[in-house]
Amino acid sequence: MTQTKEPLTKAESAELEQEIELSQYINTDDIDDDDIDVEDLEQEVAATEGKEKKVRKIRKDAVKKKPYTEDSIRIYLQEIGRIRLLRAEEEIELARQIADLLELELIRDNLTLQLERQPSELEWGKQVWKLETAKQRLVGDKKKEPKKKDIDSYLANPDNELSLENEWSQQPNKNFAAFRRRLFLDRRAKDKMVQSNLRLVVSIAKKYMNRGLSFQDLIQEGSLGLIRAAEKFDHEKGYKFSTYATWWIRQAITRAIADQSRTIRLPVHLYETISRIKKTTKLLSQEMRRKPTEEEIAEKMEMTIEKLRFIAKSAQLPISLETPIGKEEDSRLGDFIEADGETPEDEVSKNLLREDLENVLDTLSPRERDVLRLRYGLDDGRMKTLEEIGQIFNVTRERIRQIEAKALRKLRHPNRNSILKEYIR
């Protein structure tokens, strides 16, 4: 007896349609090669008759097994996948609105400097209206764009300022409402330009995985680059926005990797050189079917071997001294590394020697003490000749030699040298 297939509910049908729609332009395998492609698996099961319940079970099991962050990425990809791509004429119109938004924000920034505080939205809108009304009055029948200094000069005139105030006061609500609508439309245009190109960010971010930043961080940094591209895009140049935005997205991601992926930050130019060395090494390995030598890589990169070695050493990641060593993991890497600097015991001994030496020198006369300090560099570490010391004291080098000899004889007395003998090993 043939079993009747259970029909899908409206919500379940919509959910399956979203999965099928998403799979047309997003390959989640690129996110992690070790993961199962749940979309493909679901579609295969859904293609067989009467398996809708199994589809839902597979989806729930997959979500349970995946970490929260990966599931968040999946939801994010689904959301941006529903956003329609822009047509060329739409890009141009949105770019014009974004340019208008930047002009409005520039007026706000100038007003902030003028008022020495953040202006209210009403003050901002009023200033925009004044500037544009002044521009219209200056243009008149000339149909020539007035310069900024001409507009500023017009507004500086008290009569013109009073005239603008009176005209604004006749319809303040209407003028302010028009400004707010204009601001809303411009901001929405910027959001639409950015949201419609978020898939481009994901596509570029995938190429920079496993370089020290998580996939979520790469998407976030790339999105900041996309926002910057939307603000800088000039539609009059004739190229597509996606072509222009690609450079800004890549720049934002590579700079973030250089700044955040390493404990010890490397300059951006050095990080870019490291990336080129890696690409060159991979290319030479494919061509020669063996690991290239340092000389071959340096020749291909047109740099010296010394510079190549320096960059390669800079690219090494630091290792924590707390890294466990051995099967039992009861030892740490720091236990096996000899310290290059002085031990605490040596430092204490040196401080005690310095104190005792000062006490012994204080038993000499001031001139004898100063001569020994200069002769043996006790103050600055530089030993001076008898001639140099003689010039300082304005006496002959022979006199300095006599003072030195007398001071050393005093120091050899048992009452003095017994203290210092303890430091001789």
From Swiss-Prot:
Alphabetized Gene3D superfamilies for the sequence: 1.20.120.1810, Winged helix-like DNA-binding domain superfamily/Winged helix DNA-binding domain
One GO-annotated biological process of the protein: DNA-templated transcription initiation
Coiled coil: none
Chain ranges for the short sequence motif Interaction with polymerase core subunit RpoC as given in the UniProt record: 217-220
A Pfam cross-reference name: Sigma70_r3
Region (Sigma-70 factor domain-2): 193-263
DNA-binding region per Swiss-Prot/TrEMBL record: 386-405
Superkingdom of origin: Bacteria
Keywords: Cytoplasm, DNA-binding, Sigma factor, Transcription, Transcription regulation
InterPro entries: RNA_pol_sigma-70_dom (IPR014284), RNA_pol_sigma70 (IPR000943), RNA_pol_sigma70_r1_2 (IPR009042), RNA_pol_sigma70_r2 (IPR007627), RNA_pol_sigma70_r3 (IPR007624), RNA_pol_sigma70_r4 (IPR007630), RNA_pol_sigma_r2 (IPR013325), RNA_pol_sigma_r3/r4-like (IPR013324)
Summary of subunit composition and partner proteins: Interacts transiently with the RNA polymerase catalytic core.
This protein's name: RNA polymerase sigma factor SigA
Organism encoding this protein: Synechocystis sp. (strain ATCC 27184 / PCC 6803 / Kazusa)
Upper lineage: Bacteria, Bacillati, Cyanobacteriota, Cyanophyceae, Synechococcales
Gene name linked to the record: sigA
